[in-house]
Design a protein with these regions (language model features):
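Signature for HUH/AEP ssDNA processing cores
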Residues: 1-90, 99-101, 114, 137-138, ...
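Aromatic- and Lys/Arg-enriched surface recognition patch
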Residues: 102-141
Length: 167
């Protein structure tokens, strides 16, 4: 088995695949097929446009437009809670929250909440981690505890007031 570099970068597909499976215990799929980290590495090297995914069984996703998401990221930087998030191209920021909690944000029309869905992951083209779901400051691999969606609410509400005020 390849030695995983720590912490993995968005471009290091092999290290990411190992972190997803070994550290986070997420099932890994490449182009829809369940794979091992080694298979994922090989498939991504052969086809850089391949899509790496997981089943979002251990978390919910909260996706918002990029402008709103950028403001949320600024707000959460001041929070004691860490919110794993990744960018989807130039259009969307997706936050990972504790499984089953995303529904508490269902009243926010700008947010798309998904539970149990297939979730594309970096290093898929166009995706990059803003805040990965592991502690980048730890001496070794350490998964972050995903926050409850209500912990994201204050930052979302603050950002929404700003965005709706400029509409």
């Amino acid at each position: 088995m390849r030695t995983m570099s720590w912490p993995p970068t968005t471009r290091d597909g092999a290290a990411l695949a190992h972190a997803y499976v070994s550290l986070l215990d997420w099932p890994l799929l490449v182009d829809g097929a369940v794979v091992t980290p080694e298979q994922a590495e090989e498939l991504m090297e052969r086809n850089p446009s391949a899509v790496m995914q997981t089943r979002g069984e251990g978390f919910d996703t909260v996706s918002v437009p990029r402008g709103l998401g950028s403001d949320v990221l600024l707000n959460v930087d001041r929070s004691p809670v860490t919110f794993p998030s990744f960018r989807v191209g130039d259009d969307v920021v997706t936050f990972l929250v504790e499984a089953g909690t995303g529904a508490c944000l269902a009243d926010i029309s700008e947010a798309r909440i998904e539970s149990g869905a297939l979730v594309p992951l970096p290093p898929t083209q166009g995706l990059r981690w803003d805040t990965p779901p592991w502690d980048i400051y730890a001496d070794g691999p350490k998964a972050l505890k995903l926050p409850h969606a209500r912990d994201l609410r204050k930052s979302l509400d603050t950002a929404l007031r700003t965005h709706r005020g400029h509409s």
